[in-house]
């Protein structure tokens, strides 16, 4: 099978936006105009082609990035729809990693919104070229030039209009093309009836002004064009287009276009812009990777001739075919039924079938080529971020880094049948989503699930119910406390039962003292002269270890303690391992009154990124959560606050931050160390755990 579309004619793009800017509707329209859908599904009726998980249709938000392929004017356009909600930023990062370009969708009434800032930052990190589509031009309060202004003010983006709208709100009925120097008028609501006309007289002055600004902005980035511009020479449409393309693909310039996806206006022109200005796989730098054994850096170019290499960027469980692994091919070709090496895990994998996905239908293909995005069936060990490559030419492509989960809750199956299914379901979900973890708590036996935020876990529990038919009760979020000693003491433990027949006898003297942080429990045997026989020493150590696991104050494990066995006595007949084990645990109980035990809590290193105007509120909020601010810095037009905050005070923080900053703040946190809990809180924890 030969390649259907050349690399030059391939585009891998993402559509990124704030919630409700109209991203899914825009994708829908693209699929409609490129002939992939026959009827258009509206998001607010819950029938959109891209939103194919049930919860997405109910909530009207996009959670999973579905990969779709479409065709436009002899080009293949692979589209990845990305979610716009803070809890799903990992989905966005994961898709940006494998894209060559993106369309940022703005709401014409609001311009750049909070999540736009987050996603824009992520796209800048990955060096993704972007064009901006100002959507909802038919909405009340729509203002194209205001929206362009927010790109400059909030993102410091070098963004300039390539189009101007004719009218706005109900009157929005056409678009002026500044590059082609013409206008398009829409006669009906399906947007299929388009008339190309000269720029209407009343708009000519404004169009000339903005065309001048556009040429000036592009000329600043292109020396040849600059010379022509300064000498007053005419710049042709072809030269202007080529210069815009060059500046856009090098991420120095962001073209802005407009329309209303809902009213089907401007979508075809947006597709034209994707083809004209966003890069093909040949226009982006070759991907770098390392050879597993030698750590030597190598490059893989977008070419069918190079050895096969691909990155798995998404795992999904499909009700019909099982596990689907979405991957982007960076170099070489792959045939279905062949073997590849998962170089990240060092495992050999067989690619069963290869599917080209269209939101929720699929087409089976026999070969994928460099630059393609497809889904494989049959990969067993591959997870998100893994590299797949040719068995003879191993390479590990730069993988994705995912943040640690920040919130955890206990989850209990409602029945025995649910319990059996829950383990499998949680394993599948954590395979799909690297920021979701599930484990069994050794201390309580409960199943704990952890994720990126409250909405994230809500949706996981929801998916358990719908997709895996598991009913479960969810507990309140929990903190893993610990205990330790602050003082040293020598204590005695004596266990004696000697009332006729064989008795029990064990007797020890143990010195306890605090150990260095992070060193855990250390045991030392200082017995001289055999006052405690050698065979009983391991029993003393085991007795202490068991007792320490169950805590001395509130039932949490005791950490960072040294214990030395210094003295004791035994009985020839009555002593046993069991007796010494019990004597050791009695010594630990005796230590409680002398060793000043305290409760420790996990401290989180928190980083909050916010617009400057919320600085005061956020600092106050951090302090009220027993946090210590450790530093501040400016990052672009945002402020970064770094602080150390107890985990127990961070529950509900994502929601609080969202309301304190109108959704414009983001935060991340990682575990840093354990620290002593203030006495008043320690007393509350002890009371709660003793059930008082």
From Swiss-Prot:
Subcellular compartments: Cytoplasm
Chief subcellular location equals cytoplasm
Tell me which residues make up the tr-type G domain: 8-282
State the UniProt keywords alphabetically.
Answer: Cytoplasm, Elongation factor, GTP-binding, Nucleotide-binding, Protein biosynthesis
- List the GO cellular component terms: cytoplasm
Query: GO molecular function: any one?
Result: GTP binding
Detail which positions bind GTP.
Answer: 17-24, 81-85, 135-138
What Pfam families does this protein's entry cite?
Answer: EFG_C, EFG_III, EFG_IV, GTP_EFTU, GTP_EFTU_D2
Q: Which GO terms describe its biological process?
A: ribosome disassembly
What is stated as this protein's family in its record? Answer: Belongs to the TRAFAC class translation factor GTPase superfamily. Classic translation factor GTPase family. EF-G/EF-2 subfamily.
Explain the purpose of this protein. Answer: Catalyzes the GTP-dependent ribosomal translocation step during translation elongation. During this step, the ribosome changes from the pre-translocational (PRE) to the post-translocational (POST) state as the newly formed A-site-bound peptidyl-tRNA and P-site-bound deacylated tRNA move to the P and E sites, respectively. Catalyzes the coordinated movement of the two tRNA molecules, the mRNA and conformational changes in the ribosome.
Q: What is this protein called?
A: Elongation factor G
What is the source species?
Answer: Bacillus cytotoxicus (strain DSM 22905 / CIP 110041 / 391-98 / NVH 391-98)
Name of the coding gene = fusA
């Amino acid at each position: 099978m030969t390649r259907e579309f050349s690399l030059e004619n391939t585009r891998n793009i993402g559509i990124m936006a704030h919630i409700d800017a109209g991203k899914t509707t825009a994708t829908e329209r693209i699929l409609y105009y490129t002939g992939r859908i026959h009827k258009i599904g509206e998001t607010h009726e819950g029938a959109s082609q891209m939103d194919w998980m049930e919860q997405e249709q109910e909530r009207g938000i996009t959670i999973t990035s579905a990969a779709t392929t479409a065709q436009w004017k002899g080009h293949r356009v692979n589209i990845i729809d990305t979610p716009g909600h803070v809890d799903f930023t990992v989905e966005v990062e994961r898709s940006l990693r494998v894209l060559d370009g993106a369309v940022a969708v703005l709401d014409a009434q609001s311009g750049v919104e909070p999540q736009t800032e987050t996603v824009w930052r992520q796209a800048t990190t990955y060096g993704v070229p972007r064009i901006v589509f100002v959507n909802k031009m038919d909405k009340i309060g729509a203002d194209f030039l205001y929206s362009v202004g927010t790109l400059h003010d909030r993102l410091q983006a070098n963004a300039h209009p390539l189009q101007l709208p004719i009218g706005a709100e109900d009157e929005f009925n056409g678009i002026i093309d500044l590059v082609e120097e013409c206008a398009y008028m829409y006669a009906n609501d399906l947007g299929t009836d388009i008339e190309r006309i000269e720029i209407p007289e009343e708009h000519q002055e404004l169009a000339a002004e903005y065309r001048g600004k556009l040429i000036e902005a592009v000329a600043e980035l292109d020396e040849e064009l600059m010379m022509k511009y300064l000498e007053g020479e005419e710049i042709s449409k072809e030269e202007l287009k080529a210069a815009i393309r060059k500046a856009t693909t090098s991420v120095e310039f962001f073209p802005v276009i407009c329309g209303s996806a809902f009213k089907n206006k401007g979508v075809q022109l947006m597709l034209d812009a994707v083809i004209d200005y966003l890069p093909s796989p040949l226009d982006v730098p070759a991907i770098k990777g390392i050879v597993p054994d030698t750590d030597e850096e190598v490059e893989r170019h977008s070419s069918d001739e190079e050895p096969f290499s691909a990155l798995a960027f998404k795992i999904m469980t499909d009700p019909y075919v099982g596990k689907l692994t979405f991957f982007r091919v960076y170099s070489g070709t792959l045939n279905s039924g062949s073997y590849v090496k998962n170089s990240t895990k060092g495992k050999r994998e067989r690619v069963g079938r290869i599917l080209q996905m269209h939101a929720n239908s699929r087409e089976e293909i026999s070969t994928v080529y460099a630059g393609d995005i497809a889904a494989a069936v049959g990969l067993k060990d591959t997870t998100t971020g893994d590299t797949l490559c040719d068995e003879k030419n191993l390479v590990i492509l730069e993988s994705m880094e995912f943040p640690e989960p920040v919130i955890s809750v206990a989850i209990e199956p409602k029945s025995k049948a649910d319990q059996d299914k829950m383990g499998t379901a949680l394993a599948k979900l954590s395979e799909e989503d690297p920021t979701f973890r599930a484990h069994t708590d050794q201390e309580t036996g409960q199943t704990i699930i952890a994720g990126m935020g409250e909405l994230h876990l809500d949706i996981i529990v929801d998916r358990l119910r719908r997709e895996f038919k598991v009913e479960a009760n969810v507990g309140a979020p929990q903190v893993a406390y610990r205990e330790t000693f602050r003082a040293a003491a020598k204590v005695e433990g004596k266990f004696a039962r000697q009332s006729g027949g064989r008795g029990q006898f064990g007797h020890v003297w143990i010195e306890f003292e605090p150990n260095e942080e992070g060193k855990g429990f250390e045991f030392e045997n200082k017995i001289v002269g055999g006052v405690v026989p050698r065979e009983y020493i391991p029993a003393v150590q085991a007795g202490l270890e068991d007792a320490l696991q169950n805590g001395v104050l509130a039932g949490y494990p005791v950490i960072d303690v040294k214990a030395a066995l210094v003295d004791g006595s035994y009985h020839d007949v009555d002593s046993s391992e069991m007796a010494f084990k019990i004597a050791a645990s009695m010594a630990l109980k005796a230590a409680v009154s002398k060793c000043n035990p305290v409760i420790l809590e996990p401290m989180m290193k928190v980083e909050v990124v916010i617009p400057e105007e919320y600085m005061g509120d956020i600092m106050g909020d951090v302090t009220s959560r027993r946090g210590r601010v450790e530093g501040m810095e400016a990052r672009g037009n945002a402020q970064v606050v770094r602080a150390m905050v107890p985990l127990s005070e961070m529950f509900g923080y994502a929601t609080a931050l969202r309301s304190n900053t109108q959704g414009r703040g983001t935060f991340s946190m990682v575990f840093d160390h354990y620290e002593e809990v203030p006495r008043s809180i320690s007393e509350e924890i002890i009371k709660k755990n003793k059930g008082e």
